């Protein structure tokens, strides 16, 4: 379990939190027919994604934000035991809407999470993984997010680049 060192805003109701704990995912901003989907793994990363979504929405970009609590439930299972725990493709598609573009912002290294979330990967042109780069351990929260390329402005910049490349 990873827990934030600082208090974070409450973004769910009690019922939503229970469902999220059961399913390993929470849709923080639902946007039918989203232009881009931001998937956050980690509380600080979720806050950055929510802020980035607001910036993108100001420019008429339809943006969905997903909080992934248990990335392992979305992996390709390695055996029958994992298959009982992991969601199948049908369930994944029901819980996480298909999207034309995705950005995954994770508190873990991007290489590792890319492998774990292969089933959510739309390919190198349509999915970007933004992971922790092991920088800024003594910085404040905003400094740590910035130095690791996970601030709301960093996410917004990557999203704009992806949107312009994939027109």
Regions found by a protein language model. Name each.
Residues 2-167:
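Thiamine diphosphate
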